[in-house]
């Protein structure tokens, strides 16, 4: 089995690079991982799987744009939140519960909801016309940001206090929070009432209820996933500063091929990952 670990992140954070439809992309979405996956997809004898480490609520839309919609994948954040849905679902902002009397104002870019004459919410849409973000307001200041999954539910919410981000919750399909990330120091709390995450064979309890960072949580869940793969399986890893340590410490006992993409990784920093590169089967530049 071949596993492709992409680097489809927004800058240097554990979130996809999906953006509002009217925003100009400064960089192409295409990279070497997309090329590799499309090539292997044409070879029916080569079994493969995409391994998503970051929070990717609109991955189905992204994969459709890149001609990879039928590619099998495993999502770390789906495992964490124990999300079972796999298919896209049509979600309209009309499906959301709004206060009685809310008025929608349509601009060329987004939709603003007014309540009692005040800005109540702003709906943002992705490149495929699906709602991706709804910002909520109180007394003219943002108080909440909801991220909508292309499978038809809210999968994360950010809470603001006095206009400043306080924490971010990653949600299960029933909107109950699973992880809470503190904005001040990046520490993570696991909901003690729901301390499990999904594995290939069932579910497992988190080792702790609090972590210093998301990196620790991702590494723990990823480690279980890798342990369930075969020793002869190969991981194609797109080199990215965000996930090199998280990955490198977990897949040392597997065959690894590291791939570089000029626009993504600064070669002058290669000395910091030499230890991981030395243990690889091949390096593709």
Spans of model-derived segments:
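Long terminal segments
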Residues: 1-94, 176-285
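Repetitive, compositionally biased segments used for assembly/scaffolding
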Residues: 93-214
């Amino acid at each position: 089995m071949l596993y492709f670990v992409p680097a489809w992140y927004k800058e240097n954070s554990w979130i996809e690079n999906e953006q509002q439809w009217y925003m100009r992309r400064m960089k192409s979405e295409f990279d070497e991982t997309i090329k590799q996956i499309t090539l292997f997809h044409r070879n029916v004898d080569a079994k493969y799987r995409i391994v998503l480490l970051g929070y990717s609520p609109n991955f189905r839309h992204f994969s459709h744009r890149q001609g990879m919609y039928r590619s099998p994948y495993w999502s770390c954040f789906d495992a964490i939140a124990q999300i079972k849905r796999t298919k896209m679902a049509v979600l309209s902002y009309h499906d959301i519960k709004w206060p009685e009397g809310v008025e929608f104002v349509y601009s060329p870019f987004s939709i603003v909801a007014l309540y009692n004459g005040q800005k109540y919410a702003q709906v943002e849409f992705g490149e495929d016309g699906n709602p991706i973000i709804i910002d909520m307001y109180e007394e003219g200041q943002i108080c909440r940001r909801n991220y909508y999954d292309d499978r038809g539910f809210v999968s994360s919410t950010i809470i603001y206090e006095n206009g400043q981000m306080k924490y971010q919750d990653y949600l299960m399909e029933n909107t109950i929070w699973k992880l809470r990330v503190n904005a001040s120091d990046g520490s993570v709390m696991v909901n003690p009432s729901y301390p499990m995450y999904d594995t290939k064979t069932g579910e497992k309890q988190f080792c702790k209820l609090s972590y210093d960072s998301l990196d620790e949580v991702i590494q723990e869940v990823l480690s279980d996933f890798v342990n369930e793969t075969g020793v002869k399986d190969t991981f194609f890893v797109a080199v990215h500063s965000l996930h090199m340590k998280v990955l490198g410490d977990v897949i040392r006992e597997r065959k690894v091929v590291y791939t570089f993409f000029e626009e993504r990784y600064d070669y002058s920093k290669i000395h910091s990952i030499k230890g991981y590169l030395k243990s690889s089967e091949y390096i593709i530049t």
